[in-house]
A protein has these predicted regions:
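Long terminal segments
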Residues: 2-32, 36-49, 54-59, 64-66, ...
Length: 137
């Protein structure tokens, strides 16, 4: 009986840990990777690509700084050059204020031509912009 209980608890722990990760997928619904609750970004093969820290710092798997996400939605590269912004309504713009696309509240990612290019289910819109539009990973 104890053995079954332990196995059941382990199963729930595993399901719970996977459930905390948010997925991002391409237009064909193929999983590109996940963003874990602590900001760790992994590809579809579960290889660690890097991490987005609470202060907005983006680092690769070797802990090299790739850029930052500022509180106002400004995305900067490792040299502190402004790459673009993500507004509170999900509109993504480049450094020249040209519209790149949108990230809707349901996680749908659309390019400037309103074509669906992927999804980021449960992923913070700023993180999704880094992953889909600014290619910092």
């Amino acid at each position: 009986m104890k053995y079954r209980l332990v196995i059941t608890l382990l199963m729930f722990m595993f399901v719970g840990s996977v459930g905390n990760a948010q997925t991002f997928r391409d237009n064909n619904n193929m999983q590109l990777g996940i963003v874990e609750s602590d900001g760790t970004v992994r590809n579809a093969n579960n290889m660690r690509l890097g991490k987005i820290f609470e202060d907005g710092t983006i680092r690769d798997s070797n802990n090299m700084r790739l850029g930052t996400i500022e509180k106002d939605g400004t995305i900067r590269d490792k040299n502190n050059m402004r790459l673009g912004t993500v507004s509170s309504d999900g509109v993504v713009r480049d450094n020249n204020n040209m519209r790149l696309g949108t990230i809707s509240s349901d996680g749908t990612i659309r390019n400037n031509n309103n074509m669906r290019i992927g999804t980021a289910s449960g992923v913070n819109a700023k993180y999704a912009a880094v992953l889909f539009f600014f290619n910092l990973f």
